[in-house]
Amino acid sequence: MEYDNFFIKILESLINDKITLKRQISVNIPDTDNIFGNSDLTTTLWTSQFQCPQKFHHKFFDAIKDSRGINWIRADSFIEILGFKNKPKKVLKKYVSKRYKCYLIDIDSPVKKNLIDTVFKPKTIFIRYEGLLQLISQSNNPKSVKLWEHIAQIILPNNYHKNPVNQASILQRDNRQLVIRHIEEDIYELEDDIRN
């Protein structure tokens, strides 16, 4: 399956139970924007629906991957679990940045048509994982507070120390190997000058 484990782990920690994949629709599209210029490569876009125990009003949690590879999740399910008392639109307006939320109709993915035709209204609000983290950080729900503390105190520091951001690796992903070598040589020469 192509869905991201991040979404599942967050959800399971918030509801204190296991969730299951109910259904998934996948579509392969040509990847015309790959760094190799190879038109034979494809990107798999998907929409998934996860099911959790009956103790919540929203027992299904929906996710969709857009054509840029960004994962979006339906917002109203999480607003209930996180214990917000206000209406979903008000909560999202107050706590989630505009760039981390959008209507289903605005998500660039061919699989959204299946969702609009069968399940959702075009104005159903979806958020990115960053938006979910913004909601978790603002929730006073005890599970949310505990999860946020775990993210802030353990996951982020450990991840940063294991994988510090390397400027050269970021440039390499943009396929600029010659620039990388030049930058690495300059940095190496600069370090030698400082030591001498």
UniProtKB/Swiss-Prot annotation:
Domain of life: Viruses
Domain Bro-N: 58-163
Pfam families named in the record: Bro-N (PF02498)
Classification via InterPro entries: BRO_N_domain
UniProt protein name: Uncharacterized Bro-N domain-containing protein R125
Organism: Acanthamoeba polyphaga mimivirus (APMV)
Origin organism lineage: Viruses, Varidnaviria, Bamfordvirae, Nucleocytoviricota, Megaviricetes
